[in-house]
């Protein structure tokens, strides 16, 4: 399955909720979902009543779209979360939150996860002093993420830092904007990830059928 490259606002409208895929724009009156809060297409305003399967499917799609993950990889994450001891929902969110592209976004070095993925792909970040260009790379507690010296003048990163530096950083991450680095302190608990608009139990049930 190819990665989605179309309009991001259509994904929010399809899921019937803001996914904040465009970063700062989603908080302004330019947000397409605020103007047209219904599904795209000719019959978008007639949202059908979902079956239990449909609810589970939409929840799964929503999480995938928020984190920018394709089906095969997401399925592997769910399998890994199920095999690990403890709360499967928390295991899954910890895997998702440990992805390098997500941590770059959480640190404020990108305006959204898609931009963070591109920046990682292009080799702009170091992990513990070594270049890592794999967005799905899973960080471990106390790993240090740093912007490469030659990348610090990039306009997209300057704009992202300026937009994000006044916002509070999630408690499992520490950021030093003056030195363009941050530390992934620990894995978050399920309750700490407050910006996920779906119940992960619904997602787990989809793959448990």
Swiss-Prot record:
Gene, per the UniProt record: rpsD
PROSITE patterns documented for this protein: S4
Family: Belongs to the universal ribosomal protein uS4 family.
Chain ranges of the S4 RNA-binding domain: 98-161
Keywords: Ribonucleoprotein, Ribosomal protein, RNA-binding, rRNA-binding
Function: One of the primary rRNA binding proteins, it binds directly to 16S rRNA where it nucleates assembly of the body of the 30S subunit. With S5 and S12 plays an important role in translational accuracy.
Annotated GO MF terms: rRNA binding; structural constituent of ribosome
Signal peptide start-end: none
GO cellular component: small ribosomal subunit
SUPFAM superfamilies, A to Z: Alpha-L RNA-binding motif (SSF55174)
Biological processes, Gene Ontology terms: ribosomal small subunit biogenesis; translation
Subunit structure: Part of the 30S ribosomal subunit. Contacts protein S5. The interaction surface between S4 and S5 is involved in control of translational fidelity.
Keyword Nucleotidyltransferase attached: no
Name this protein carries in UniProt: Small ribosomal subunit protein uS4
Transmembrane domains' residue ranges: none
Gene3D superfamilies noted in UniProt: Ribosomal Protein S4 Delta 41, Chain A, domain 1, RNA-binding S4 domain
């Amino acid at each position: 399955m190819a990665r989605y490259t179309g309009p991001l606002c259509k994904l929010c409208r399809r899921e019937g909720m803001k996914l904040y895929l465009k970063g700062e724009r989603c908080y302004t009156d330019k947000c397409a979902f605020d103007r047209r809060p219904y599904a795209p297409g000719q019959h978008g305003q007639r949202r059908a009543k979902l079956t239990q399967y449909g609810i589970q499917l939409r929840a799964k799609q929503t999480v995938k779209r928020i984190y920018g993950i394709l089906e095969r990889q997401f399925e592997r994450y769910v399998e890994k979360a199920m095999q690990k001891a403890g709360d499967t929902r928390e295991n899954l969110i910890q895997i998702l939150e440990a992805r390098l592209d997500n941590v770059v976004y959480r640190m404020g070095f990108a305006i959204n996860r898609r931009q963070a993925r591109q920046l990682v792909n292009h080799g702009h970040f170091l992990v513990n002093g070594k270049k890592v260009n794999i967005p799905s790379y899973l960080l471990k507690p106390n790993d240090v993420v740093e912007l490469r010296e030659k990348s610090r003048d990039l306009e997209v990163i300057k704009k992202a830092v300026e937009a994000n530096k006044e916002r509070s950083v999630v408690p499992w991450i520490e950021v030093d904007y003056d030195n363009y680095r941050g530390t992934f302190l620990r894995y978050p608990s399920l309750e700490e990830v407050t910006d996920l608009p779906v119940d992960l139990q619904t997602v787990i049930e989809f793959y448990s059928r």
